[in-house]
Amino acid sequence: MVKSKKKTITIVIVAIVIMIAIYFLINVFQPPSLDNPESIAWDGTGSRFLISNTGNGKILYTTDFNQYEVLINEGLSSPRGIKFRTDTLYVADNTVIQIIDVKEAKIVESIPIPGSKMLNDIECDKEGLLYCTDTGANKLFIVNPHTKEINSFISPLMTKPNGIVFDGPRRQMFIVCFKPASPILAFNIDTKTFSIFKETLYDNLDGIAIDDLGRIYYSSWGEKCIFMIPQEQNRTIIWQKDLKAPADIYYHLPTNEILVPLFEDNEIKRFKAD
């Protein structure tokens, strides 16, 4: 009886050790993969794409979207929007903007954002100021990464702000919101005022991008597609459809492509902007 109990205990211990070993092998040696990809940025210095993964808190990089490597493995909570500028990656991470030195592959500074709840997308202007939407707090934050000056802006026009992109020629930010029938908002960076650029009938807008011809693209979870506004800005067309949970889209000038992270399918689609 005693021998039987010892044998059973031994078997259980061996089984536990084997399970731990299998778990370790899977998690350590399994190639990195997308986990709720949210945003994409281009690292011009390293000639690679950077991708934020909200699911596991990692920043991955790739050159071809077939194989991925880890840039940042720890220190982030829920990285969403990312913006690359002069060897630095700015990350909207819940209530903090994380600053990453991409050459050293490490977080070098964190800027807590008072009054924030869910920082989402992030953009910068030509002067290097950061503009960060907060979907939870219904705010737009403007952050000077050098002086650490932070200002917040609200508007009755803006509910659950999500994607943001800089319209340089007109010195304004376009913002879309994760709500029913979200308009495209314009935020004038000189006067600090909001206005409606274009009304839409579409729900839960996530990302917005502008190509080199001035065409505007935005993604909708509700309609599961990417819409495009042509240069004339006189209509809106369905540009790509059957896309589940299209997140923060990105225009890549060197290849003239719109890159679309599919948040729930853990995939990135590439479409020529022809």
Task: List where the protein language model places each region.
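N-terminal Sec-pathway targeting helices
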Residues: M1-I16
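Beta-rich, blade/repeat-based domains predominating
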Residues: P32-G46, E74-N94, P114-L130, P156-A181, ...
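Beta-propeller domains
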Residues: I51-E69
